[in-house]
Amino acid sequence: MSNINEKDLSEFLESNLRSLNDIDDAVATSSAECNYEDYEEFTNSVDLTFFEQDLSGVLKELKKLAESVVISGKKCDIRNIFEESDVATMKFNLFVWYFLENGQRSDSSEEDVDKGVSAASSYIAMCSLPGAISDLYQIGLYNQCLKIIRNCCHTVRIGETVVTKKSSGAKKKKAGGKSDETNVDGEMTVTTGAADPIIGPPRIAVDSAERYLHHLTTQLFAFLHSNTFSIDTPTLMSTLEVVEDIGRLDLDNRTAGRAIRANSVHEFRSLERFTDRYCAFVHSLVESKYKTRAEVAYGRLIRPRLALMPYPDESNKSSKISTERKRSGELHVNLILSRISRNPEARELKYIQTVTVMVYSQCPDLAEFRTNIATFIHKILEALPYTYTYDFVQFMNVLFKGRGAGVKSLSTELSSILISSFDFTAPDPGAIPNLDAEQNEEEDEEEEGEDEEEEEENEQDDVAVKEEEQSDKSDEENDGDNEENVSKKKEEKKKEKKAKEVKEVGRMDAMSVLYNIVYMACLDKAAAMRLHGANSLTKILQSQSHREAFQLFCATINAEMDEKFGAVGDNLSESLEDLNVSGKAPSSKTKKPTDLLLDEQQIIQKFNKLKLMNKGETRVEKDIVYMIVRRLSTDDKAPVKKAACSLLKSYLSYCDEASKFEVVLSILQMLCRDRMVSVRKTGADAFTELMLRDAILFKESLSSKWLHTLISMLNDTDNDVTEHARKLIMKVLTPLLENSSDLTWTLLDTIESVTNHRQYLMSTLKDAVREKLVKRTVMDSMKQHIISGSEKLDGAWMVFSQLCVQFEQNVDFAIETFSRVDLSRESNLVQYMIHVIENNIKKIDDDTKSDLVNTLQGTFRDYCLHPSHSRSIYHCLGKLMDGIGDRSLHGKEFSDFGETLLIKCFDTIVQSFEMFKDKDEWKRNSESQERLLCTALNVASEVFSYSPQLVPRHERLGKTLSLIVNSTENGSSDASTVNPDMPSVHHTRPPTQLSEVPSSQKSSKGGMMSHEGAMFSDKVRAVGVVTLANMILAHDRLLKLMPMLVKQLQYNTAHQIRSNIVLAIGDICSSYKTDRYAPMLAASLCDPSVIVRRHAINQIARLISFGIFRFNGEIMIRMMLASLDANEDVRNDAKLYISEVLQSEEPNFFPLNFVQYMIALTQARRLVGVGHDEDDRGQVDVAIGGGDPLARPSRIAIYTFMIDSLDDRSRFDVKMSICQRIFTPIVNGEYDFSDYNVQCLLDDALLIMASNEMQVKMDVGKNPNENAMDDPSPEVLEAATGFMQKVYLDHYMKTIVPSILSLREFLNQHRSPLQRKCLLAIRMICIEHKNDIDEILQDNRQLKDEMMFELQRVKQRTEEANRILDEYLKRVAEFKKQQKRLSKSPAPMELDAEPVQESAEAVEMGSPARRIEEDQENVEEEVEMRTPQKKNPDADVPRTPLNALRSTTEEKSTPNARLLSPKTIKKIRRSLGALIHTEMRLNPPNLEETKIDDTTINRSKQADKTEEKTIVEEEPMEEAAAEKTVTAENDHVDAEKTVIAVEIPPATEAEEDEVVDVQSESRRSRRRKTPNYDDEESVDADGKIWKKPKIVNKSPEKEVNISANVTLRRSRRGQSTEPPVVKENSNRKRKSVDEEEENVPTSSSGNTENDPLSRGVTPLIFDESKLGAGRHCSTPIRSREDADPSDVTFSLNLSAITEKEDLKNRSKKVKLITFTISSKRMKRKADQCHCINLPSKFVLFISTVCIIVRLSAVFSLN
C-alpha cells in the first residue's frame, strides 16, 4: 500500500506538474533565498500561464494523495518521490507559493481560499514525510500555511468576517462623500478608492472554514507527530499560536473537562471537536522527542492559561476574567492532571512544578484571579507526588517574603486550602534531586561562560557609562536629561545584579510555613492582606488540631523574636530595628514637611517601650490567637470587620476562659453597632449562629448579650437592618418556643422586663405570624405553661397575649383569668390580659361584655385599682362601651362616665385638703389617702385624654392642681434656687431672642398662691403634673398655668416633679408647635438630677427632629456642655445626638458654629456701637455661669471633641473663621482687650491656631467607598498633596497670614504675654508650608529669621530626645541579652558589676547650663544611681525549696533585673518633657505614670447608682500638677517649698464670714469643668481624679518665672537664684540672714492669721499664668480696688538682675531673702498715706522702695 501510494503520488506529480521544470532555476533559487517573501518579483519573473489554469482539481487530488500517504503511517522518503516524478523540489515550492499567496489575502475569493487550503494541506502533509528537511521544507512557505490556518480559525471563532478599511474612519467617509454599498446578496462592498486597502481574513462561509480546518489540523498534527526534524524556535512559537487559536474554537463546559490524547493521525482525524484536537496537539508536543517542544508547550500554552492571562488579540484587559479564560484554565488543569496520571518522567514533573511556581508568583492582587488560581494550584498539588508538593510549600516560604501584594494574598488563601486538605505530618523528603548530573555540569560550564561574558559586558558597560559621564560633563554640563539617563542605567544594572543574587533560605516544616503565612497576613499593614489573613485564620480555628498547632507555632515564633530583638511588648510586628536605635533616619522612609509634629508621639512610644524593656516584664497575654482576634475585630476597614465577625464566631465557639469570652463577646456587640450597615448585619448573623450552637460553655452570658443586642437593632435607623434583626430573632426564638425549656422562660422574662424590648418583640411576633413563621402550637404551649402556675409567667403571658390577638382565640380564658386578678396590686400580667380582651371584643358575647363593663365601672368608681393599671383598663372600658373614636356609638355614655369620675376626683382632693389640715389625722391616714389621690389623678388624666371636651367644665380642677404642684416648704418667695440657670424675670442681661419668657412669679400675695408649706408628698405632686399637662394639652386657655410649672423647674427640690415638668413642656411644645419654652428645656440640661437632664436631652432631640426647635442659641451651647456632664449616661446621650444625629443631618455644623462656641464658652462680649450687630455675625448672647468663662480644661475638651470630627477643609474653614471673627475684631477694637473674657477668647483662638490637632493633614486619596480595600498609589497621593498644598497656601496668603500678622503687631503694641502664642500660631503655618516660608513672610525678614530658628530648634530638640532614648534602648537591649545568656548557662554565675550598674552619666537636657550642672552632681549621685544590690548575693546562688518555686515574672521584677533605676527613668522622663514641644497641642501628652485608684472608681460607680444625683460646685484644674511637672522635681529645695506652700493655717473669722458670699456665688454659678458628687474631689470623663488644691499665695516674680521658657528654668534649676515660695508661717528660726540682720523687725504670726486676705495683691494688670484658668472654685475673687493691702508679702527674685550680668560664678553666691513686713506697720503707713490722700499705687511703690533700700544694706553687710 505504501509503494502504491508512493507511486501514485509520483506519477501524479509527473503527469500534472512536470511543466514546472520550465521555470528558470535562478528564480527558484532567489525565491528560496528570500524565504518566499518577494512575491511581486516572482510574478514578474515567471510566465504565469500555467498557474492561471484551472488547477483546483489538481490541488484536491494532490491533497488527497498526500493525506493518504500520511495516514497510512508507512515511512517513505519524499526525496524519492520527487526523483521519480522528475519534478524539481524547489520549483514545486514555487507552485505551492503561488496558491498560498493568493489564498491568504484579505480580498481573496472563496475559490482562491479553497485552492490555498488544498495547497497548504498538501505541503504540510508532504513536509511530514522523511527527507522533507532537504529542500521541500521552507520556513517561509510553512509560515504562510500557518497564516491560512489562522484565517480559518478567525472566521470560525467570530463568524463571517466584515471587511473593514485600513485607517479610514467615519469622519473621513463623511468628508469624502463616499459611502458603502450593499450588493444583491446582502454582502457589503467597499466603493472607496484603491488607495484604501482592506485588512482581515478573506470572506468565506463558516461551514467552509470548519471543513478546511479539519483538513489542515489533521496535516499539522501529522507534521508535529512525525517528529521527522526539529523546528527553530520562532517557527515553533508561530505553530503554538496557531494551536492556541484552535483551542479557542468550541470551548465550553463539556469540552473543558476533557483532555483527550491521540496516538495516531487516524485517531486524531476521528476527533470532531476542535478542543479535543487541541488537547491532542498539546499531548503530542509534550511527548515529542525534542525537549524544546515540551518546554515551549508548558511555557507558551499551559502557563498563560493557568495564570488566566488575556489572549494576545484581546483588547479588554480589565480586572474581570472572561468566561472563555476561566474555561481554558480548567481545560489546562485537566491536561496537567492527565499528564500526571500517565506517570511522566521526572523532567516533565519538574516542568509542571516550574509552571505552577510561575503562575503562583505572577498572580495579580485581584480577588477573582486569586480565587481561581488558588483552585488550579490546589488541584495540581493534589495530583503531584508528596515530594513536589512539599517542595512547593518551601517555594511559598521564599516567595512570600519578597513579592508583591498579589503573591501574599494568594499565599494566604492557598495556605488555608492546603492546611485543611493536606497532611504534612510525614517528614521532609528533602529537595528534588538533579535530573542529569552531566547535563548540569554542562549547564554549569555554559553558565560560567555566560557569567564571564556578562562580567566582561558589565565592565564594558561601566567603562562606557563612565565615558558617557565624562562626555556629558565636558560637552553638556547643563543637560539634566543625560544625567538622569545615566543614573537610571546604574539603577537598572544594580537591580539586575541584586536579582541574580539569590539568598539561601533554610527549609522549614511545611505546616510551619503555612502557619507563618497566615500569621504574618493577620499582622500585615495592607488591609487586603489582613482580610485574607482573617479568612484563613477562621478556617484554622474551626479545627481543633490545627488550632492547637497554630497556637504552639505562634508561641514558638514569638519566643524566637524575643530572643532576637528583645521582649518589647505586645506589639507583634516591631523590633529594635524599627526603633531606629542607631539614631539615623532610615533611608527608605521619606518624611513630609509636616512629619515634624508626629515625632512627639513616637518619642512617647519609645519612652513607654524603654520602661517595659527595663522592667523586663513578660508579655501580658500569651494567647496570640486571642490578641490577633481582638486586633482584627477592631480594624478600621469594613471588609476586615466583616471577616472578623466569622473569626469571632469561631473563637467564641471553643473559648473556655470566662474573661476572654466576655471581652470578645463585647467586641462582637460593638460590631453589631458599627456605623456600616453591612458590618452590623454580618455581626448579627455571627451572633445568631453562635446562639444556635449548643457546645457553648458560657451560654447564659451569650444569651443575655445576644438578646439585648438583637432587640436593640430592631430600632435601627436602617430598615434593612431592622428587618434582618427581626428574622434573626425569630430564627432563634421559634425553636425555643416550639420546644420550651428553662432557657425559653429565662429569655422571655428578660425581654419582658425592659419596656422597649417588650414592644419590639410584640411587633416581631405580629410580623412572624403574618409570614407563618410561628404556629398555633406555640400559643398552646404558652397556655399550658400559664395553667401550670409556674413562677416565670410574665414572658409566657407576653407571647401568649400577642398570639391570641393574631390568631383571635382564647379571649374567654383571658376574661376568666382577669376576673380572678387583684387589681389593687401592681402586676404586669394585667396589661397582657387587657390586650387580649380589647383586641378580641368581637369574640365576646353580649352578656359577658355587659358584666365586664359593670365590673370595670365599679372598679373605677371605688378606685379599687393600682395607678399603673388605670391607663390600660380605662382604654379597655372605652373599647367595651364603644365610646372611643369618631365613629363610636356610645361616646356620650362614655363621656358622662368620665365626668362622674372627674367629680369624684375633685371630691377626693377636697377630702384630702380637709384631712391635711389636721396633722394628726393626716399622719395616720397619709399613706392610704395619697395612694387614693394618685389613683384618682391617674384616672382623671386618662379621662381628659379620651374626653378633652370635659376640660373647660373642670377648669377649677386644673387650678387646684396648679396650687398643689406650686406649693413649697417655706413659700415660693423664700425658696432656694435648685437650678439657677433657669430663665426668670430678673434678667442679669438684656433679653435675647430665645430668652424672652413669660413671668413665672405671682402677681399678688393673696389667692391660692398664698398657701404656705408643701401640700402632699412629692409623688402626688408629680402625678398632678401629668394630669395638669394633659389638661393644658386639651385646652389652650390653661396655658396661663405654664409659668407656674416653669417656676418649679427652678425652685422645686423634688426631681420627680421636675422630670415630669420637662416631659410636659416637651409635649406642649410639640402639640402647639411653639419654641417659646426652648430656653427652659435648655436650662434643664443644668439640672442637678440626672433623670431630668436625660429627659431634657431626649425632648430637645425630639423637638428638633420635628422641626419645632432649632439647634442654635442656648440649646446649642448647653447641649455641648452636657457632653462634659459628670454622669456617663448624660454624656453619652449628648454625644450620641451631636455626633450621630446632628452631624448626619448637618455635616457642616461644627465648622459654621465653632467660633460661636468659643465666644459662648469664654463669655466674651463685643462693645456696643462698634458698627456691626452681633446678630449679623450669627452670634447669640447666651449667659453661662453669671458671665464668667468656662474652665479652661472644659473648653479644651469641647474644642477637641469638635476638632476630632473635622476634615482638612473644615479645619481650614475654622481657621479662617477665627481670623475673621476673632482676630480682626479684636485688632479693630470691637472687643475690650483688657477684659478677662476677651483675653481667654484670644488665648483659646491662638492655642487652636497653633495646635497640632488643627493642622491641615493633607489627607487626600481617600476612597468614599468604605468597602474599598485598594489605596491610591504613592505617586498619585504625592501629586494630590502637592496640589492641595498650593491651594491652601494661596488661601493662607489671602486671609490667615495678614490677619495673624496684624494681630502680632497689635499684641506687640500692648506688650501682651500672648505674643509667644501668636508666634506659635505663625510657626504652625510655617511647619505646614515649610518650603514656602519665604513667600509667607516675604515682608518681614526678622520674623522669617525667627521662624527659621524656631523650626531648627524644634528639630534639634526632637533629635536630642530621640538620641537619648535610642542610647538607653540599646543599652537595655544589650543588658537583657546578656542576662538571658547567663540564665541559660549551666553553672550559676554572678553578674558583673559593670553591666548591672548604670552609667554615672546623667541624662542630657536641652540646656547647656543644665548639662554642666548635672556633670558636677554626677560624683555625688553615683552611689544613688546604682541599682540596689542584694545584701548577701552568695546566699542566693543555689536553688533552694524556697526560691525554686519563684516564677519568671517575680525574678524579672526584682531590682537586679533592671539596668535603669527609677531615679534614672524619672530623669529621662523630665528630659523628654523639656525637649518635646508640648506647647503645640491642645492636650499635651503626659509622660507621668498615672494610675486610678480602684476605690475611687468604685465610689464613682456607687454614686452613679444613687437615685438623686446633685452636681456640686466647680473643681479646680490640673494646673498645679502641671506646674509641678514643669518645675524641678529633683531639687530638695523645691520639695521643701512645695511642702511649705501646701501648709495653710486654719480659716480665720474673716474667711468664715465669706461663706455666705460663697453660697450666693454658688447659686449664681452652676457650670463647672467637671460636675461631681464630692466636694473635695471629682472624676472626669477620662477617669482622672481632680483634687481641690488649697489656695497658695504666689508672688508676682514667682508667676512670671512659671510662665517663662522651660529650657531657661531647667538651666537655672541648681542655682540659688530660684524664686522662693511664700511661707505662710514665718515664725521658725531664720538662718544666716535672720541672725545678721537683727534690726529688721519680724512680723507677728497672729496678725498674719487674722488678716482677711492671705493671697497678696499682684502688681500686674494681666498675667499669662492665670490666663484661661476660669472659675476654679466657688470662693469669690475680690478685685484689686476692694482688697485690703494691710498685709502684703513680697518675694523678690534676684535672677532678673543676675541674668543680665556676665559673671555667672557670682550668681551662685547670691542668697535669697524673704522679708515679711508687719501688718501693723504697713497699716500704719497706709493710714498716714490715706491722711494725705495718696493713691494706693503710690503706697505700694513707697513700700517697694523701702524694701530695696534694706536689701542694699544687707548686701553691703555681706
UniProtKB/Swiss-Prot annotation:
Residues 428-501, 969-1008, 1379-1460, 1500-1656 are annotated as: Disordered. Chromosomal protein which is recruited to mitotic chromosomes by hcp-3 (CENP-A) and hcp-4 (CENP-C). Involved in chromosome segregation during mitosis, playing a role in chromosome condensation and in maintaining chromosome morphology, rigidity and orientation during mitosis. It is found in: Nucleus; Chromosome, Centromere. Keywords: Cell cycle, Cell division, Centromere, Chromosome, Coiled coil, DNA condensation, Mitosis, Nucleus. GO terms for molecular function: histone binding. The keyword Coiled coil applies. One of its GO terms (biological process) is attachment of mitotic spindle microtubules to kinetochore. InterPro entries: ARM-like, ARM-type_fold, CND1/NCAPD3, Cnd1_C, NCAPD3. It comes from the Eukaryota. This is Condensin-2 complex subunit hcp-6. It comes from Caenorhabditis elegans. The gene is hcp-6. Residues 969-979, 1602-1618, 1640-1651 have a biased composition (Polar residues). Residues 438-462, 474-484, 1414-1423 have a biased composition (Acidic residues). The keyword Cell division applies. GO terms for cellular component: condensed chromosome; condensed chromosome, centromeric region; condensin complex; nucleoplasm. Disruption phenotype: RNAi-mediated knockdown results in temperature sensitive embryonic lethality with chromosomes displaying segregation defects with increased anaphase bridges and chromosome lagging. Residues 999-1008 have a biased composition (Low complexity). PANTHER family: CONDENSIN, CONDENSIN-2 COMPLEX SUBUNIT D3. Component of the condensin-2 complex. Residues 1326-1385 form a coiled coil. Residues 463-473, 485-501, 1424-1437, 1500-1512 have a biased composition (Basic and acidic residues).
